């Protein structure tokens, strides 16, 4: 259960909060503000009431953790800055709407009863483009959307709990190469982190479907060590895939997808697990008779696409709604969407594009103004997260 209110003063009451979402959308849903999608309501709002910091408060029960397990609290994004506290303990700052936060809360949760999670969200401030980036720079108003009260401040991405053992898998991803249509090379990368104060030995197991490609790789980690594991066909012969089901853009073939299930085991017990969905594809670029040409899997692509300004101007598009909206682009015979100024950050958007054969021209959070962000360090850190 979430609630949001101004950090100071009584300009607005406390209301149930929509998480993920922006502050202003919560006040619209609570009936404090008229729906800005009708009439001239967007221009009648007293914007000054939202030009301030807000505090989110969430309550949750302590889940069963188990012996030797670690309880994690994960934040996927807060706009623009956030300070996270659990039961009075500060967990850390978040800076930029793409920066994720992973917090070990095993010893901070209440043994019984409810836990109090507080997030102080700092208002974005002026001027927005490009000084306040990384943020939704169109929130200050554009030719296609009005000013968004509060500049889309809020807990704008998912917040959730997870469990792991002493060793966890961090940010696994897959890279593929397609030398020809009958052969592909799959490269798997993941960080493994030993959170204990003792060295450990374990096994990284994986299975890729379809195809039933199974593998195992022994790993030894020193106490507190974090290391990147890279597996190619040299370590796992099955990662040289014969007759692969290739991912093709809309109109060129099926957008085939694979899943890779990774499990790290210590002493025969699962410590952590992750699942990655990916397409076997390889992009290429070339100049042909003075023309820049995009290729995929060795074939030239005639790009047909449109500009995706935002999912919804108050960030109210979630989950399966992305599938409907991306499917409309497929039905229009598009094969590319430009994620304009990086204004859509949800994983559901990228997953829907994968399923429907839509390539993404993915911008960062800068427009054509020559000015740079005030905090280049935060911009660069968020670029790595993206």
Q: What is the predicted role of each segment?
A:
Residues 360-362:
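Hydrophobic residues in well-ordered beta-strands that form the structural core
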Residues 337-347, 369-372, 376-378:
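Acidic-and-aromatic substrate-binding clefts and catalytic sites of carbohydrate-active enzymes
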Residues 379-386:
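An active-site-proximal structural segment forming one wall of the substrate-binding cleft
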Residues 1-340, 344, 352-356, 385:
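Secreted/periplasmic carbohydrate-active enzymes, especially glycoside hydrolases
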